[in-house]
């Protein structure tokens, strides 16, 4: 059985990047929550 994590910088950015988060209402809520927590990195 192959490993489930097959790293790809492009896929990582597209799925979890800042612009991907900003594109949806839910993603914006994610960023808002992380800002409220004081996270250093908001997204991938």
From Swiss-Prot:
Keyword ATP-binding attached: no
Any GO molecular function: structural constituent of ribosome
A Pfam family recorded for this sequence: Ribosomal_L34
GO cellular component: ribonucleoprotein complex; ribosome
UniProt entry tagged with the keyword Ribonucleoprotein: yes
Keyword annotations: Ribonucleoprotein, Ribosomal protein
GO biological process, one term: translation
Family that this chain belongs to: Belongs to the bacterial ribosomal protein bL34 family.
HAMAP family: Ribosomal_bL34
Name used for this protein in its record: Large ribosomal subunit protein bL34
Species of the source: Rhodospirillum centenum (strain ATCC 51521 / SW)
Gene this protein is translated from: rpmH
């Amino acid at each position: 059985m192959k490993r489930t994590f097959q790293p790809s910088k492009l896929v990582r950015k597209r799925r979890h990047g800042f612009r991907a988060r900003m594109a949806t209402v839910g993603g914006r809520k994610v960023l808002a929550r992380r800002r409220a927590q004081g996270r250093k990195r908001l997204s991938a």
